């Protein structure tokens, strides 16, 4: 490996979605700093924070079709049975909802929790209440995606919060997706809910920190760990 490659690999990439914000903060820093120099340093701090917010690190992804992987970085805020949102079309039977709350310091790149085919994507406008509240899953702006995996259908819902005002989803209906694949982001603090079948063996608890693409939320087969592989992406 060359020296240039070593230097390149030591830096965490920044997602292109963040470029406009980073440039805007830096330009404003120069403009306001010309008026009053302390404002330049304030703006520079915001620019560095913006770079940090839009970081897009590679992850060591466990490749196992029986495992459900966390789609987001953050803290597990809810693990409970509930009926999924009507717009997902997952029926009126209870599923397990796992909620991951992302604060403004979390990495906000969202990843696919399990391989399959995107059956539907449904956007719903709504409020911008605190994403940590239980009612956020019903009343906040959100974007829902249903993945048809070999084990059945799983719902993934991106939920905007009090600060987040922009949900981004790159996946399209009928796309084939794989575990750990990047599929979207939510800008500036938010939550992600995942709805999984009740027969899944849970591997997380409320209060635990989850890492997108790496943390195992649950498994369909307790014996599957013997066949695990990893992918770096």
UniProtKB/Swiss-Prot annotation:
An example of a Gene Ontology cellular component annotation for this protein is: plasma membrane
Any keyword Ion transport?
no
Q: Which residues carry this modification: Pyruvic acid (Ser)?
A: 190
- Subcellular location per the Swiss-Prot or TrEMBL entry: Cell membrane
**Protein name, entry field:** Phosphatidylserine decarboxylase proenzyme
Say which family it is in: Belongs to the phosphatidylserine decarboxylase family. PSD-A subfamily.
Q: What does this protein do?
A: Catalyzes the formation of phosphatidylethanolamine (PtdEtn) from phosphatidylserine (PtdSer).
Question: Which cofactor(s) are needed, names only?
Answer: pyruvate
The cofactor note reads: Binds 1 pyruvoyl group covalently per subunit.
- State where it is primarily located: membrane
Indicate the quaternary assembly: Heterodimer of a large membrane-associated beta subunit and a small pyruvoyl-containing alpha subunit.
EC number annotated for this UniProt entry? 4.1.1.65
Query: What biological process terms from GO does the record include?
Result: phosphatidylethanolamine biosynthetic process
Q: Where is the active site?
A: 190 (schiff-base intermediate with substrate)
């Amino acid at each position: 490996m060359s020296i240039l490659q070593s230097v390149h690999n030591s830096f965490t990439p920044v997602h292109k979605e963040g470029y406009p914000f980073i440039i805007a903060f830096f330009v404003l820093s120069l403009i306001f700093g010309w008026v009053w120099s302390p404002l330049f340093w304030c703006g520079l701090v915001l620019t560095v924070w913006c770079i940090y917010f839009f970081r897009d690190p590679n992850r060591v992804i466990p490749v196992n079709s029986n495992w459900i992987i966390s789609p987001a970085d953050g803290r597990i805020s809810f693990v409970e049975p509930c009926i999924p949102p009507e717009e997902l079309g997952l029926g009126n039977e209870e599923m397990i909802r796992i909620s991951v709350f992302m604060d403004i310091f979390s990495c906000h790149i969202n990843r696919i929790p399990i391989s399959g085919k995107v059956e539907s994507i449904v956007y719903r406008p709504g409020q911008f209440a605190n994403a940590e509240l239980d009612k956020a899953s019903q009343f906040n702006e959100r974007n829902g995606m249903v993945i048809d995996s070999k084990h059945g259908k799983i719902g993934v819902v991106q939920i905007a919060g009090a600060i987040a005002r922009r949900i981004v989803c790159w996946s399209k209906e009928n796309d084939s997706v794989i575990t750990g694949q990047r599929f979207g982001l939510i800008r500036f603090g938010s939550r992600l809910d995942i709805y999984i079948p009740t027969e899944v063996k849970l591997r997380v608890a409320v209060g635990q920190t989850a890492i997108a693409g790496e943390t195992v939320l649950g498994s369909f087969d307790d014996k599957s760990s013997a066949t695990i592989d990893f992918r770096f992406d």
